């Protein structure tokens, strides 16, 4: 019996040793075609039921059974799946795997190639160059089509995010905050934005709950990184709305990109109801030089010069508005002209040093922004407002508008940044010192004469309907600092764990102009559960401030009919508490990849500075007088609606309220619903023909008569409805030719802007009769226009 037990024990021992000998360890790293590690790529052996995910550095480690052949599959959304066959593996095996980009997602890739962990989504606009565009600002037009974002003018690159104003959106280029012009009051004047889409490499955009490294704005953060090309490249494009050229040069240690853009929307403005001589000319040049004298040193320089001229001599205008049963006609004959100038200089210089451990980097950045702005016009008009059916005169008179607005602004900054990476943490901090100098000298007035009487009519004195004077200087110094950590950790089963990404940080700022110091703690958590790798939950909260700048400071007081604008030193930062919960689900339908995102948010607003909006001009009350809220839900479906092309559909529902002087009213940017659709398609059987369709349908904004209290908001404008379609033909494709050429692609395009010719309302002109009765005459946006374009890529 003892002998039998001994045999059994020895047999079990040899069996266990044999089983142990049949296992092996597989380890390695997964990276993209450029050698960058791919996080959360799946490494699976389906025959053995084994699955692990790569870590932050793209590394993996898995224990497997040794067989004659072991089939290992490497997969990640946005990349081509790769399979490796291991023959009789033993001991420890190491694999270095590179995944190629998935060409089936080569159209406009809106989401990043990895699941979105934080509140910042990664956008790619390089293929938007073939989409129809009225502004030529591809990045901003891409932003305007995202969930929670809206615009009400195709002439403007500005956008509202979840009930916020244009001024509540921060923009960064290579870690330096940039600014928009101060005096711009209409989309016609805007010209080109500071972001050159040809030079953009990465775009990060957050609609709320963003990280502590992004500045003191309440609504959104746009983070732009300019490209460092790996080889010489370039393009030249031209259309009826302007032209652009881009050249990128690359050597072993140096890259140099240059972009030149010219825009004239004279052709587009010809479809407006106000006829006259439009002479808009916008010119922009940018350069980005990056030099690596050693592997651990990098020196960067960005320079920008922008010159925007807007000259206009109106002649006449006729507008018909109202209902089918009650049609009114508004006719004006003009004298005078407008002449505006916006000249901007911007530059940054950065030195970055990586320590020997290659995990820590230190950067010193300096920047300078300078703008010179002039807005000058003297325009007189004789108008008639009549009832069309009865020819009854509802208002007859003359008005004269005068403006001499001059502004100079200079902002200089120096910033020290520190970044430290480990396997699970990415710690980042910075300190910034800014010097702000702004000088304004403005004089505006508007005079109206209705049926021989000056408006407003008192029977005694002569008054202007509006008169404003401002002579102000701002000398401010601002200190900003932040510290944040991005922590990756996991729990549960080692082979298929639940993945977490926690971002937490705090931001501090002090401004000597009003003596205010603000602290802004922020945090977000992303969870990818073990039971479904295609599902991600995100939660974010934080205290956000809108630090006042020049426009918010302008407080007004009226003496003897003249409004004086002065700077309010007692104003405080507006405040918003964000609470966000979202879900992202990645799936396949019809054997094509899709992604559905749903996000709910609530923003508690306090210490608000009320403002009114006319076209794109935001005029503030100059004091913290209100509180309120903004809440809603944003839905987005992204994927291949048609094989080989990416499209997306967004739906946003929102409710905003502001309590002002004891009365609850909607915010001036209250938009109860918005639908955006971007669709890309190819002709069957060929990639030479491409079609892009952009659709926007958004609720109208609340309006009230000018120079009246904001709480007397009287009505809501009609919904904004617009469809643009573009057809592109690839005349030349170098990849299809055996004999190579300097050109990679040549595209010919034809766009139809405002396909259905819908008359959208941008703002209102208010006609007042002698009885002080006011009539709102709509100012319509552009009509249907055809645009031709050509693009050479090399």
Residue spans for each PLM region:
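Surface-exposed extracellular loop regions of Gram-negative outer-membrane beta-barrel proteins
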Residues: 267, 315-316, 320, 531-579, ...
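Short acidic/polar hinge/loop motifs at secondary-structure boundaries
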Residues: 61-63, 177-205
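C-terminal beta-signal and adjacent terminal beta-strands/loops
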Residues: 697-704, 729-794
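Face-selective signature of the C-terminal outer-membrane beta-barrel domain
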Residues: 292-308, 337-514, 597-600, 648
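Gram-negative outer-membrane beta-barrel transporters
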Residues: 489-491, 495, 601-604, 623-704
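Outer membrane beta-barrel strand-and-loop segments of large Gram-negative receptors
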Residues: 403, 411-415, 572, 591-650, ...
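Membrane-embedded beta-barrel scaffold of Gram-negative outer-membrane proteins
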Residues: 363-367, 373-377, 570-624, 629, ...
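Short, acidic, small-residue-rich periplasmic hinge/interaction motif at the N-terminus
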Residues: 31-34, 41-46, 75-80, 89-132, ...
């Amino acid at each position: 019996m003892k002998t039998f037990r001994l045999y059994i024990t020895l047999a079990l021992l040899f069996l266990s040793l044999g089983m142990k000998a049949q296992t092996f360890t597989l380890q390695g790293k997964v990276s993209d075609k450029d050698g960058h590690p791919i996080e959360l790529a799946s490494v699976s052996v389906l025959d053995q039921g084994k699955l692990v995910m790569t870590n932050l550095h793209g590394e993996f480690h898995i224990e497997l059974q040794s067989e004659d052949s072991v089939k290992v599959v490497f997969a990640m959304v946005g990349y081509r799946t790769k399979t490796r066959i291991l023959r009789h593996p033993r001991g420890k095996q190491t694999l270095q795997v590179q995944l190629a980009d998935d060409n089936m997602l080569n159209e406009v890739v809106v989401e990043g190639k990895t699941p979105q962990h934080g509140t910042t989504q990664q956008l790619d606009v390089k293929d938007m160059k073939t989409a129809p565009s009225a502004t030529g600002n591809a990045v901003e037009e891409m932003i305007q089509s995202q969930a929670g974002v809206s615009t009400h003018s195709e002439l403007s690159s500005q956008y509202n995010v979840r009930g916020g104003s244009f001024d509540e959106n921060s923009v960064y280029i290579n870690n330096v905050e940039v600014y928009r012009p101060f005096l711009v009051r209409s989309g016609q004047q805007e010209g080109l934005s500071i972001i050159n889409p040809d030079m953009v490499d990465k775009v990060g955009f957050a609609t709320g709950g963003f990280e502590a490294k992004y500045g003191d704005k309440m609504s959104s953060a746009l983070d732009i990184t300019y490209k460092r090309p790996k080889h010489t490249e370039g393009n030249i494009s031209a259309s009826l709305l302007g032209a652009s050229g881009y050249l990128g040069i690359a050597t072993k240690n140096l890259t140099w990109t240059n972009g030149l853009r010219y825009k004239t929307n004279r052709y587009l403005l010809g479809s407006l109801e106000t006829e006259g001589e439009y002479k808009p000319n916008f010119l922009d040049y940018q350069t980005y030089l990056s030099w690596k004298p050693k592997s651990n040193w990098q020196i960067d320089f960005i320079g920008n010069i922008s010159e925007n001229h807007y000259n206009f001599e109106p002649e006449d205008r006729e507008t018909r508005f109202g209902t089918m049963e009650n049609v009114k006609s508004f006719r004006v004959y003009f004298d005078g002209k407008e002449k505006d100038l916006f000249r901007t200089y911007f530059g940054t210089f950065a030195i970055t040093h990586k320590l020997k451990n290659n995990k820590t980097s230190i950067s010193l950045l300096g920047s300078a922004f300078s703008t010179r702005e002039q807005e000058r016009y003297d325009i007189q008009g004789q108008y008639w407002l009549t009832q069309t059916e009865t020819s009854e005169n509802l208002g007859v008179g003359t008005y004269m508008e005068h403006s001499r607005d001059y502004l100079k602004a200079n902002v200089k900054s120096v910033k020290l940044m520190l970044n430290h990476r480990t396997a699970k943490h990415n710690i980042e901090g910075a300190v910034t010192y800014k010097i702000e100098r702004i000088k304004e000298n403005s004089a505006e007035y508007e005079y109206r004469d209705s049926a021989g009487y000056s408006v407003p009519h008192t029977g005694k004195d002569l008054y202007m309907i509006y008169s404003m004077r401002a002579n102000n200087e701002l000398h401010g110094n601002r200190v900003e600092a932040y510290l944040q950590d991005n922590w990756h950790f996991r729990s549960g089963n080692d082979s298929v764990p639940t993945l977490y990404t926690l971002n937490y940080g705090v931001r501090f700022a002090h401004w000597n102009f009003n003596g205010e110091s603000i602290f802004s703690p922020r945090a977000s958590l992303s969870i990818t559960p073990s039971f479904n790798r295609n599902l991600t939950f995100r939660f974010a909260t934080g205290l956000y401030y809108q630090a006042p700048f020049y426009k918010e400071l302008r407080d007004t007081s009226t003496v003897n009919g003249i409004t004086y604008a002065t700077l309010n030193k007692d104003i405080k930062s507006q405040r918003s508490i964000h609470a966000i919960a979202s879900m992202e689900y990645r799936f396949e339908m019809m054997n094509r990849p899709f992604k559905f995102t749903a996000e709910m948010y609530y923003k508690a607003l306090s210490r608000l500075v009320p403002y009114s909006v006319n076209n794109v001009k935001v005029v503030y009350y100059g004091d913290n007088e209100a509180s309120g809220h903004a809440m809603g839900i944003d839905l987005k479906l992204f994927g291949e609606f048609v094989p080989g092309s990416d499209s997306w559909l967004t739906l946003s529902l929102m409710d905003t309220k502001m309590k002002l002087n004891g009365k609850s009213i909607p915010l001036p940017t209250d938009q109860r619903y918005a639908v955006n659709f971007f669709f890309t398609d190819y002709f069957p059987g060929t990639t030479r023909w491409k079609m892009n369709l952009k659709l926007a349908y958004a609720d109208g904004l609340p309006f009230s008569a000018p120079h009246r209290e904001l709480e007397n908001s009287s009505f809501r404008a009609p919904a904004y409805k617009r469809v643009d379609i573009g057809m592109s033909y690839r005349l030349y494709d170098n990849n299809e030719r055996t004999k190579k050429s300097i050109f990679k692609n040549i595209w010919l395009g034809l766009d139809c802007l405002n396909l259905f010719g819908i008359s959208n309302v941008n703002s209102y002109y208010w006609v007042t009769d002698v009885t002080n009765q006011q009539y709102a005459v709509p100012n319509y946006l552009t009509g249907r226009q055809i645009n031709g374009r050509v693009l050479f890529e090399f």
